[in-house]
Design a protein with these regions (language model features):
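Cysteine-nucleophile amide-bond enzymes
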Residues: 26-473
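Bacterial N-terminal signal peptides that target proteins for export
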Residues: 2-14
């Protein structure tokens, strides 16, 4: 027992010494962001340890680090806390209105959430430190923070991605005050085995296939008309999805493609498959059930008239079919591994406080409000993929009972742009949306789920064009 206690203390001492042994003001880090460690050491006593009244009496300062990057040290007050901020200088494009005209200009700014910003939060009531935040990503909602442990001697680490905690309360054997002067490189070294850094480091240059697909789809959107139950078969002929029968296309839209939301995602997958196989995907394998339904349950009764899992089956079978063509080997859905079922988060911060992250629910997917942080991680960890999304909504039965049904589907392309900022393009029912716009289509309904299946993106993408549509009278 004594040995275990000794080892635990030894680890704490080792971690503390490891932090101190690093070059104290290391400027370079793997995210290549500016660092204020040297500046923070110079101002620590006044700005970080002084009372609120003392800090209020200090003027904002502009100081330069060893490589010449300027930081502004300043105070900001909120209702119950006050913040001491070390923010790096950046430039912001602005429009200046003067003399009846507008001219573009560039102004210096010191944003609280810029990559390289450092924020100390303290209580107004007693001045006690609450947290230190390091901003390192181009997206303001992605950061790492440290909090004092209840023992008063050590600290806890959190990693946050858009209000979802990839790690929360990870114990570290160093005093909280370490983070007053620790560089970003030092805190990376300290937490490299404790925090999921791989989930927040974008892979530059690996999104080309997805971006080619996005641009090609975008260029074809003017030629797509939304129509219920509409798709094209393996020969490029218009058919009904429900029964595979030939579908009449009115003369006024003959020069366009008529597609339902499910036909639209098939059209995208066909654009991957046709260059490899010489034809489009057959419909019949795409409607095969992937979920065993209790025939006496609500879904079983509904299934007698309509498939409650239609777009779930459709997207799963589509992803498996694309994988089969690529591998030149028939893979059924159950053997394909195309479902996204990762659980990258433990908790989520909401208006009601911390809540356990619902995560993945089998044959249901993820809550829609969970999509943004999830897609951020997927874009980081699996940069060469896009996702087919089956959308689950709640339908009320004739006797007032509620059943989840999968009617529609979409294609989602998450990526990081040239500046390292996270983006997600959604193509749904022949229309392009940002992720925020797409989620807004469903309001704030908490019962919307999205089930994802992965498909590898490719620059060799040639979807069916209206001119190639065979006449079907």
């Amino acid at each position: 027992m004594e040995r275990k206690v000794f080892v635990k203390k030894g680890i704490s001492v080792f971690l503390f010494c490891a932090v101190c042994a690093l070059p104290f003001f290391a400027e370079w880090n793997s995210f290549d962001i500016p660092d204020s460690a040297e500046i923070r050491r110079q101002v620590s006593r006044e700005w970080f340890e002084g009372s609120l009244d003392v800090v209020r009496g200090l003027n904002s300062e502009i100081r330069s680090n060893q490589v010449g990057t300027q930081f502004q040290i300043r105070l900001e007050e909120q209702q119950d806390i006050f913040l001491v901020i070390a923010a790096p200088k950046s430039q912001m494009k602005v429009d200046i209105y003067e003399g009846g005209g507008v001219r573009a200009a560039v102004e210096d700014s010191y944003n609280i959430d810029s990559p390289g910003a450092w924020i100390l939060a303290r209580s107004k009531q007693n001045g006690s430190p609450l947290s230190v935040r390091y901003c390192f990503a181009k997206d303001a909602g992605v950061y790492v923070q440290f909090r004092p442990n209840q023992d008063g001697r050590t600290s806890l680490a959190d990693m946050i991605i858009f209000d979802s905690y990839a790690a929360r309360g990870v114990p570290l054997g160093v005093p909280f005050e370490t983070f007053y002067t620790a560089s970003f490189a030092q805190i990376q070294a300290l937490t490299k085995n404790n925090l999921p850094w791989a989930s927040v480091q974008p892979k530059a240059g690996l999104y080309d296939g997805a971006l080619v697909m996005v641009q090609t789809i975008r260029e074809n959107l003017p030629n797509i008309v939304s129509e219920d139950d509409a798709a094209y078969n393996e020969e490029g002929l218009p058919v009904f999805i429900n029964n595979g029968q030939s579908r009449y296309v009115p003369q006024e839209v003959r020069q366009k493609l008529t597609l339902s939301s499910n036909g639209f995602v098939k059209w995208i997958c066909d654009g991957i498959v046709e260059p490899l196989a010489g034809s489009y995907l057959k419909l019949k394998p795409l409607v095969q059930p992937t979920v065993n339904v209790n025939p006496t349950g609500a879904k079983g009764v509904l299934a007698a008239k309509y498939s409650a899992n239609f777009s779930l089956d459709w997207t799963r079978n589509l992803a498996a079919a694309v994988l089969s063509v690529r591998n030149n080997k028939t893979l059924l859905y159950k053997d394909s591994g195309v479902d996204v079922s990762v659980e990258p988060f433990a908790t989520r911060w909401t208006d009601k406080g911390f809540q356990n992250a619902a995560g993945y629910i089998a044959n249901t997917g993820y809550r829609m409000q969970y999509l943004k942080p999830l897609l951020y991680v997927l874009a980081t960890v699996n940069p060469q993929y896009f996702y087919l999304a089956a959308i689950r909504q709640t339908a009320k039965g004739s006797v007032g009972n509620e059943t989840g049904v999968f009617n529609d589907s979409a294609a989602i392309f998450p990526y990081f742009d040239a500046d390292g900022k996270f983006k997600a393009i959604v193509f749904f029912d022949g229309v392009e949306y940002s992720l925020q716009q797409f989620c807004s289509l469903y309001g704030k309904a908490g019962d919307i789920f999205v089930h994802l299946t992965r498909v590898k993106a490719t620059a060799k993408f040639y979807p069916q064009e209206p001119a190639k549509e065979k006449k079907n009278d």
